[in-house]
């Protein structure tokens, strides 16, 4: 189980969960709500770092937003920096999957001195819904099915069984081999979604574009993506790699949106090799 912490910052009180040993690593997602059961993506990093899994404003037991603008991506980054300061870290690492990766990019751009490294998995620096290869594009054959699942998941009246069934269906759409779902998602981990944060994200994201700022990122960056990702298609990871100087890009040929589960051994070794190279560089300095 992950250990809960309530942190008071200059921007309010935030709930986070910690696990692992090593240098501090920040991890979050734009609209997920975490708890003591943790997170599959976060688990990968607990062998190399002390992971801080953060419930953002309006998620879990963190401070509530007074106005929707407080849920914007840039305000979220200011919240993360305030949490770092409250924890008395001068720097920390960051790893993010999907919208978590999007936040990681913006963090590295906004506070270039705060991150020792950045891992971005299945994310994008611009509106990934603009391509019909993305399931969130109206031309995608599974667009309406996915929208129906998302809207149903927003309901506060779902039973735990109903929520689990809807979440399973939503996740299976984003697996290269859906039949392997049970072998990937076997841990007693349960998360929920902050409807307010999801709605704020959907309002902001169509106008979101960090392409021109990627070249300013100096943080050591690893970018990975499943070759068959239908949420954040691989072309967006390639775009990030081309925009961020000296970044490393590793595609996962037999994965969709969850390479850390679909090709777990390969993903773990890729992550560990990345951090090993960072330590070697720091030793040589």
Segments and roles (model prediction):
Residues 116-152:
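Flexible "cap/lid" loop of the alpha/beta hydrolase fold
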């Amino acid at each position: 189980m992950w250990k809960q912490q309530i942190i008071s910052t200059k921007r309010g009180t935030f709930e986070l969960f910690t696990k692992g040993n090593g240098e501090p690593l920040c991890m979050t997602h734009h609209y997920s709500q975490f708890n003591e059961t943790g997170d599959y993506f976060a688990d990968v990093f607990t062998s190399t770092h002390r992971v801080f899994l953060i419930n953002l404003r309006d998620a879990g037991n963190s401070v509530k937003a007074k106005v929707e603008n407080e849920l914007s991506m840039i305000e979220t980054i200011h919240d993360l920096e305030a949490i770092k300061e409250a924890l008395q870290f001068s720097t920390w690492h960051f790893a993010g999957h999907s919208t978590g990766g999007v936040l990681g990019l913006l963090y590295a751009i906004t506070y270039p001195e705060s991150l020792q490294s950045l891992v971005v998995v299945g994310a994008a620096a611009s509106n990934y819904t603009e391509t019909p290869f993305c399931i969130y594009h109206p031309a995608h054959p599974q667009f309406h099915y996915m929208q129906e699942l998302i809207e149903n998941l927003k309901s506060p009246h779902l039973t735990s069984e109903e929520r689990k069934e809807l979440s399973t269906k939503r996740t299976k759409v984003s697996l290269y081999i859906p039949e392997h779902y049970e072998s990937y998602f076997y841990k007693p981990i349960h998360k929920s979604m902050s409807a307010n944060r999801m709605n704020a994200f959907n309002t902001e994201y169509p106008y979101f574009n960090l392409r021109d700022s990627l070249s300013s990122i100096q943080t050591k960056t690893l970018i990975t993506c499943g070759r068959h990702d239908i949420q954040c298609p691989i072309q967006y990871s390639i775009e990030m790699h081309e925009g961020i100087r000296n970044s490393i890009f590793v595609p996962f040929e037999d994965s969709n949106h969850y390479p850390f589960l679909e090709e777990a051994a390969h993903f773990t070794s890729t992550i560990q090799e990345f951090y090993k190279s960072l330590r070697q560089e720091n030793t040589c300095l």
